[in-house]
Amino acid sequence: MRRTTSRSLPRTVTLSALVISATLALLATSTATATASTAQPLNGLFRVASGSYFRMIYPGGGKYFKNPYSADTNKTYTLIVAGTGGGLRTGVLQPAPTPAFGPHGNSLAGRIIRPADFAGIDFGLATKGTAPAISVSGGRLSGQVKGFTAEWNNLSFSQGGPVTGSYNALTHIYVLSWSSLISGGPFNGFTGSWHLTGTFVP
């Protein structure tokens, strides 16, 4: 019987394959590292301008709560304007004042936004515990606003979470969005949807 033997690849071919494989792995690692290193933190003020709003989604999704006191023709949008601090600051906290509420449960937290009428009671915004942190990479924003809190009717609602958005380095115009589940109070189980836009000031 004829004996068959397996034929091995020439040593030079094997070495070439190993070199190519190692080079590709190195390039992939370098690319990932470069991408991560290009993310730059934006520490400063995200000014709140026209076009910023809050919406509230019913449990289960698909339907938005109508705020009869909204200044917009579409009552599912509650328009928000800058407060005394100009907007949302990263790297520092913007706590609610003491006391945090006035008569009838109206919020006195007016640094981030001017308290807005929601269902007959003014709500304000504050940041507590963890300062907001937002970075930009390739014109895309990412980060967190874990300490973002809505103050309304003598209650504080955590509305923090991861954020996404866009940023133009030439005009400094940004768009920032996120959503957060509401726990407790009369709107327990609803989801708050936030949309901020304006300019960033370092």
Per-region residue spans from a language model:
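Predominantly extracellular/secreted and cell-surface proteins with exposed
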Residues: 62-167
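A short, surface-exposed beta-strand/turn
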Residues: 156-173, 193-202
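Alpha-helical protein-protein interaction elements
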Residues: 16-18, 38, 45, 93, ...
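Short, hydrophobic/proline-enriched secondary-structure or compact coil segments at domain edges
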Residues: 44-50, 138-150, 177-179
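Polybasic, proline/glycine-rich intrinsically disordered low-complexity segments
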Residues: 169-183
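Secretory targeting and sorting signals
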Residues: 2-36
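N-terminal segment immediately downstream of the Sec signal-peptide cleavage site
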Residues: 35-88, 180-202
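Sterically constrained small-residue positions within well-ordered secondary structures
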Residues: 25-27, 134, 167, 187-189
